[in-house]
Amino acid sequence: MPPVSRSSYSEDIVGSRRRRRSSSGSPPSPQSRCSSWDGCSRSHSRGREGLRPPWSELDVGALYPFSRSGSRGRLPRFRNYAFASSWSTSYSGYRYHRHCYAEERQSAEDYEKEESHRQRRLKERERIGELGAPEVWGPSPKFPQLDSDEHTPVEDEEEVTHQKSSSSDSNSEEHRKKKTSRSRNKKKRKNKSSKRKHRKYSDSDSNSESDTNSDSDDDKKRVKAKKKKKKKKHKTKKKKNKKTKKESSDSSCKDSEEDLSEATWMEQPNVADTMDLIGPEAPIIHTSQDEKPLKYGHALLPGEGAAMAEYVKAGKRIPRRGEIGLTSEEIGSFECSGYVMSGSRHRRMEAVRLRKENQIYSADEKRALASFNQEERRKRESKILASFREMVHKKTKEKDDK
C-alpha cells in the first residue's frame, strides 16, 4: 500500500472548500460543513484503512459530548489529519489511565468496607466484654454459693456480727478523729484572735507608755526563761523515766530469759533420757588425759578412726554398712548362726573397709604394745624404788640402834 502524504490531503480539502464558497457566494451552513467533512473522512477511511484510529465514530462522540453545534454524538472537526492521529494516541492513553483509576477506586472502596466491618466487630467485642453475652452463657451469680461443709448458718451470723462490730468501731474512731480535729481548729482560731488583739493593744500602748513596755519586755523575757528552764527539767525527767523503764524492762526480760533457760536446762536431761538411740551404741570411752591421740593411718574421715578404735578397745566388732539399728552382740549372734552381714558384692567397698579396719587394728596393736611397754617400765621403776626405800630404811634403823 503506497504511503499517503498529509500535505497533499490538506491542500485538496482547502481547495474544495474555496470552490464551494466561490460557487455559492454565501458562507456554508454548518450542516453542509459537517456533511462535507463526513464525506471526506469516510472516503479517506475507505481508501486508507490502515491509518484509521482504533475507535468508532460513536466512541469519539461519547468522549466529546459537547461539540460546537450543541449536539452530543458528532465528531470533532479536524483540519489536519496529523492532529487527528495524535488525538487518537492521547485518547488511548486516557482510556488506560481511566481504567487504572477505576481499579484503584474499587480497591479503596473495598478497604473502606473492610475497615468499617473491623471497627464494627471491635465495638461489638468491647460491648460483649463489658456487658456479657447472656444468649451464649448465663449471667454470673450475684452472691457466691456457700458450701454446706465449709460454712454453717451460725458461722455466717458470727461473720456478719463481726463485720458490723468492725464497721461500728471504725465509724466511732472516725467520729472521734473528727471531733479532735474540730476542737484543735477552734483552739487555733482562738489563739490567733487573741494574738491579734494583743498586737492591737500593744501598738496602742506603745504610743502612750514606752517605759512600761520596756518593763513588760523584761518581765516577758524572764517568764520565757523560766518556761524554758521548766521545759528542760521536764525533758530531763522524762528521759530519766524512760531510762528507768528501759532498765526495768531489760531486767525483767533477763529474769524471764533466765527462768526459761533454767526450765529448759531442767527439761533437757529428761528429754535426753526419754529419747531412744538409733543405731549401735558407742562403747564407753576409756582414755586418760596423758595419752595423746594416735594416728590411725591415711584415707580416713575425721573422727572415723577414733570411733572405730573405741569398738576395738572394748573388744567389740566394728559395725559395717547396712548394720544400722543392731548392736554388736546381735551382729555377732547373726554371724554365728550363719547370716552374712556384709557381703562381698561391691569388691572395691569391701577392700576399702578391710584396709580401714586393718589400719585401726594395727594402730590399736601399736597402742597396746606402747601401753604394755609403759606398764612394764612403771613396774620396773616401782620395784627399783621399793628396793631402794627398803635399803634406806634398813640403814637408818641400824644407825638408830647403834
UniProtKB/Swiss-Prot annotation:
The UniProt regions of compositional bias labelled Basic and acidic residues, in chain numbering, are 105-129, 246-255
Q: Does the keyword Transcription apply?
A: yes
Predominantly, its location class is nucleus
Q: What GO MF annotations does this protein's record show?
A: chromatin binding
Report the Pfam families cross-referenced here: NKAP, Nkap_C
Quote a single Gene Ontology cellular component term.
Answer: nucleus
Q: Where is the composition biased (Polar residues)?
A: 1-10
Transmembrane regions:
none
Q: Which UniProt keywords apply?
A: Differentiation, Nucleus, Phosphoprotein, Spermatogenesis, Transcription, Transcription regulation
Positions in coiled-coil regions: none
Q: Describe its function.
A: Transcriptional repressor of Notch-mediated signaling. Required for spermatogenesis.
- This chain's protein is named NKAP-like protein
Q: What is the lineage of its organism?
A: Eukaryota, Metazoa, Chordata, Craniata, Vertebrata
